[in-house]
Structures are given as structure tokens and as C-alpha cells.
Amino acid sequence: NRRFFRLSPLRKQNIVSKIWRAGYPVGIHFIISQIVAGTALAVFARTAANSAETYYNYTIFLTGLTGILAMIPALYFYRRDKVRRIAGGLIPAQKKVPLSLLEIILLLLAGAGLAQYGNFLMAILQSFINSSAYQESMTRITEGKSLLMMIFWMGIIAPAAEEMIFRWLIYLRLRDWLKMPVAAVISGLIFGIYHGNIVQGIYAS
């Protein structure tokens, strides 16, 4: 019926519409990050003697704030997409099956294994990549900061927001018309490129 074709991702779309639908969530995160950063710099320019240094001191908090704000539209679009997928028959309208303890452990081990793979890849590419600038920047951002604060903002909030944007939205939207391996590779590449440097890009992908 008319409602089905209006809601369902299965409705006919041209390539431009598909690229836009899969890509604009990146723009949402980028715009929010720029608004947060621009506002912070404007405030620091008026209140701090060294606005650049003050900005570095608050980078962890600003990164987390960006994540929290990005979660709001991400949740909205994810829920809307879910309604469309159910209406279009892409997913069944049934309750989620909870993971067993064994499945959770296996997923954690798989994540740890992939992290080790990232470390191994970085070791191979170390001779070709100059990561000193990135390391210096991270040292400047994290120096003197509380471990709990870094874990909360940069280890939980920021990654969770990026997962919502890049996995819940971009990956699942690519899955609406692409096979899983292709969608995973494309979304991973977008995730890595968005970070703006090779070091983070390898881990993000």
C-alpha cells in the first residue's frame, strides 16, 4: 500500500538517494562537533588568556559532549529506520533474543583479537607512518587528566555515539541494499576516513 512504499527502504531509490541516505549521518556528527568546538573557542577567546591551550584542556569533555548531543538524532533516526524496515519486511516485528553468557564472552574475545590485529598492523606500518604528531597531540590532550574522566568521556560516551552513527545508521542503511561483507567494509572505511588520520583510521575500521 501507499504507506508501505513511503516507509520501506525497499522502495525504489536512485544511486544519489542511496548515497545521501547512507552518508548524511556523518554530516550530523560533523556539524554537531563543529558547533561544540566553535562555541567553546568563542567562550575561551573571551574568558581565557590562552584560548588554544584552554581548548586542549577541555578537549576530552568537549568530545564527550559532542557524543551526547549526537546520540539524540542518532536514536531518532535509528528508531524511524526500524519502523520502516518492519513495514518493508526487512526485519521481523519480534522481540530481540538476548545473548547468552557464552556469546558475550566470545564477542569480547573477538573484539580483543581484532584490537591485537590492529596493533600488529600498526607495527608493520610504523616504518611508513609518521604518527609522532598524533601521539604528541594525544599526550597534550590527556596529560594531567583523571583516568576515570578519560574512560567515561573518551572510552564510553564518544565511542558509543560513533557506533550509533556509523553502525546503527550507516552500516544498517547500507545493509538495506548491499550484502553484509560489502556494507561492513564500506561503513568501516567511512568510519576510519572520518577520523582524519591514519592511526585512528586503522583502529576505527
Locations of regions flagged by a protein language model:
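Aromatic-anchored segments of alpha-helical transmembrane domains
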Residues: F30-I35, A112-Y117, G188-N197
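Juxtamembrane helix-loop-helix connectors linking adjacent transmembrane helices
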Residues: E53-N57, I86-A161, D176
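Hydrophobic alpha-helical transmembrane segments
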Residues: I19-G27, I60-F61, L101-L109, L148-F152, ...
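N-terminal juxtamembrane cytosolic/stromal segments of multi-pass membrane proteins
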Residues: N1-G23, K82-L90
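Transmembrane helix-loop-helix hairpins at the membrane interface
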Residues: K145-S205
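Membrane-interface elements of multi-pass transporters and channels
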Residues: I35-S51, R80-R85, I124-E136, W168, ...
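Alpha-helical transmembrane segments in multi-pass membrane proteins
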Residues: P25-K82
